[in-house]
Amino acid sequence: NKIYDRTGRQVMLTGVNCASLEWLSNPEKLVTTVNYALDEWHANIIRLPLSQDRWFGFGGDQQGTDESGDRYRAIVNEIITNVAKRKKYLIIDLHRSNCGSWGEFISGNMPDMNSLVFWKDIACRYGNHPNVLFGIFNEPFKVSWDCWRDGGEVTVEYAPQNIGNQIMRDESGEPVLEKITYYAPGLQKMVDTVRAVGAKNIAIVAGLDWGYELDGVDRGYTINDRGGNGIMLDSHE
């Protein structure tokens, strides 16, 4: 249960989560913020949350400006380059899925089939990069351990928003919820997709209950690494 670099030296990772690319396509000062965390706070790892929609140019703020996703991916690449130059590490975190519909912007409680497309592309670009770890999916929730590992049909509730981005509410003040059902491939399939292109990067898998519970692992719900450099379990407080 330890991490080693390519020289066999044990590595202890202590760092920060640098948010914004999961909800913005061109956030201000993100690169500067990451560099500050590395240089002034002496973090040796950065967790970088991403949106699979924005990775491919489906963000609302990308229409007419970055519909290919090139600029978005360039920001990510610049950050990875800066981290690697300092001989530190970065987690590519799939933070926002889209319930199987590009541009839907309803983040699912599990990855979806489009998440496989995202990870195949990431693995082709950053497979076996010595400074990059793969955070397979941010926080699974409201599914069984069977679905978590092996996949299945899932339903997520979400609150539609009106103009001004205020959550719509009924006369009693309760949020108006809608439901969407989609197929989740399961975390084993996600790891398999990464390994299928030859990427052996450490794969990080979060537990259930918003990435908190890991008791299912003790009951046999483990992820097969398929010859990679290891599976890291992730628990969020």
Where are these regions (language model features)?
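Conserved phosphate-coordination/catalytic loops
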Residues: 24-28, 70, 113, 181
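Substrate-binding cleft and catalytic face of glycoside hydrolase catalytic domains
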Residues: 34-126, 130-142
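Extracellular glycoside hydrolase catalytic/binding regions
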Residues: 20, 112-133, 137-237
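A generic structural signal for short coil/turn motifs at secondary-structure boundaries
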Residues: 22-26, 56-58, 144
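Residue-level recognition of alpha-helix initiation/capping sites
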Residues: 28-29, 74, 117, 185
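Short active-site-proximal "capping" loops at secondary-structure junctions
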Residues: 21-23, 51-55, 210-211
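N-terminal carbohydrate-binding accessory modules
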Residues: 1-47, 63-66
